């Protein structure tokens, strides 16, 4: 279990039960270790303790989301609970935190989150449903409220800046744009992908960027569901991270590829869609697997990676060079060393399997025709 996200003031990394806040320059500001539940004593038929203890499911971080305005961190855990932490700045720029309320139990694990600060709520999705939580309400326990669903697995979640639209994408090629808070009112669908839609982001001028397993990156009008442009990627895409470039109306996209050591790079123009273009991809050492990627406002790319043999985690940092239209490695960046110090000898036992997202066609005739062909050829030879 792991995640990496970049906010305006912090870089946040989580692996297993540890969450670390870094400054944008890579300095360590605060660490949170998820408290594990105590073992439960078994009881016999007479409800008397029998001396045995049942170990609870480990509570490791699945994903998290931070709200800068309220300074609240919401964390989804692998034991089907999620927790909140209230953060506070101390002298010297360091942070401290305290649990906020009780653990909230959900029917299924929450796999993606987005804060909606104007409404004071958090959106969270499990496999096929999206829920609303009153995560910023400090006076009550935020029980989940169902707001929308899909017929297949939800893979990505985005919310417009004005909080009028919730956009969700799924394994069955669909991108759904729902009104908020009247989520039963579907504004439109963005249809055109032919494989799972792994990543979506709303950008300025009410535009939407999406990437898919069909090897395409697409730009949409989010209010009408109209496709504005399409770029052909080299490989299927898993997800992406995006930031606005300093000049013009362009968005730099770093697309995490199905090829485990590659990030594809694109510049998407939202005022002149036809001007969008692909740059040369970034390929790292074959001994590493890219687990997650984040792009900062200064166009600094952070890659959370894992060594294939040792399973140890590593952080890689790159700076974008506009003249060369490529990312350049920053091996001496402080974030690299500080990340290593915080997660030294931490290993990832299991990497997420994305092969299950692709369509599987059932063909009952191919084998039959092959056998028939062999049989006919054998008869001719006689």
Swiss-Prot record:
Residues 40-59 are annotated as: Disordered. The keyword Repeat applies. The keyword Cell membrane does not apply. It comes from the Eukaryota. One of its GO terms (cellular component) is tRNA methyltransferase complex. InterPro entries: Trm82 (IPR028884), WD40/YVTN_repeat-like_dom_sf (IPR015943), WD40_repeat_CS (IPR019775), WD40_repeat_dom_sf (IPR036322), WD40_rpt (IPR001680). Pathway: tRNA modification; N(7)-methylguanine-tRNA biosynthesis. SMART domains: WD40. It holds the Pfam family WD40. It is found in: Nucleus. WD repeats lie at residues 149-190, 192-230. GO terms for biological process: tRNA (guanine-N7)-methylation; tRNA modification. Residues 49-59 have a biased composition (Polar residues). Keywords: Nucleus, Repeat, tRNA processing, WD repeat. Required for the formation of N(7)-methylguanine at position 46 (m7G46) in tRNA. In the complex, it is required to stabilize and induce conformational changes of the catalytic subunit. Forms a heterodimer with the catalytic subunit. Belongs to the WD repeat TRM82 family. This is tRNA (guanine-N(7)-)-methyltransferase non-catalytic subunit wuho. It comes from Anopheles gambiae (African malaria mosquito). The gene is wuho.
């Amino acid at each position: 279990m792991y995640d990496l996200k970049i906010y305006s003031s912090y870089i946040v990394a989580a692996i297993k039960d540890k969450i670390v806040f870094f400054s944008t320059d890579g300095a360590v500001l605060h660490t949170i270790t998820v408290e594990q539940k105590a073992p439960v004593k078994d009881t016999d038929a007479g409800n008397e303790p029998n001396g045995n203890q049942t170990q609870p499911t480990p509570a490791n971080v699945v994903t998290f989301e931070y709200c800068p305005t309220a300074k609240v961190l919401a964390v989804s855990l692998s034991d089907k609970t999620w927790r909140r932490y209230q953060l506070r700045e101390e002298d010297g720029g360091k942070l401290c935190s305290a649990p906020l309320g009780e653990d909230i139990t959900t029917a299924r694990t929450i796999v993606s989150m987005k804060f909606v600060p104007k409404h004071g709520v958090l959106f969270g999705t499990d496999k096929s449903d999206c829920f609303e939580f009153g995560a910023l309400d400090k006076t009550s326990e935020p029980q989940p409220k169902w707001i929308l669903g899909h017929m297949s697995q939800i893979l990505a979640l985005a919310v417009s800046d004005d909080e009028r639209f919730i956009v969700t994408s799924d394994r069955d090629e669909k991108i759904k744009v729902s009104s908020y808070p009247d989520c039963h009112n579907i504004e439109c669908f963005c249809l055109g992908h032919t494989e799972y839609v792994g990543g979506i982001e709303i950008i300025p001028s009410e535009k939407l960027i999406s990437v898919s397993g069909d090897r395409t990156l697409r730009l949409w009008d989010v209010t009408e569901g109209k496709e504005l442009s399409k770029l052909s990627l080299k490989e299927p895409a898993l997800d992406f991270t995006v930031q606005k470039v300093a000049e013009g109306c362009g968005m730099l996209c770093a697309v995490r590829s199905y090829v485990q050591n590659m990030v594809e790079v694109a510049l998407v123009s939202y005022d002149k869609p036809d001007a969008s273009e692909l740059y040369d991809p970034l390929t790292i050492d074959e001994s590493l697997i890219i687990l997650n990627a984040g792009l900062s406002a200064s166009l600094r790319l952070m890659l959370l990676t894992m060594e294939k043999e040792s399973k140890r985690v590593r952080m890689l940092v790159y700076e974008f060079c506009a003249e060369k239209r490529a990312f350049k490695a920053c091996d001496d960046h402080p974030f690299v060393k500080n990340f290593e110090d915080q997660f030294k000898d931490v290993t990832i036992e299991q990497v997420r399997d994305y092969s299950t997202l692709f369509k599987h066609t059932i063909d009952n005739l191919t084998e039959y025709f092959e056998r028939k062909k062999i049989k006919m050829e054998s008869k001719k030879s006689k």
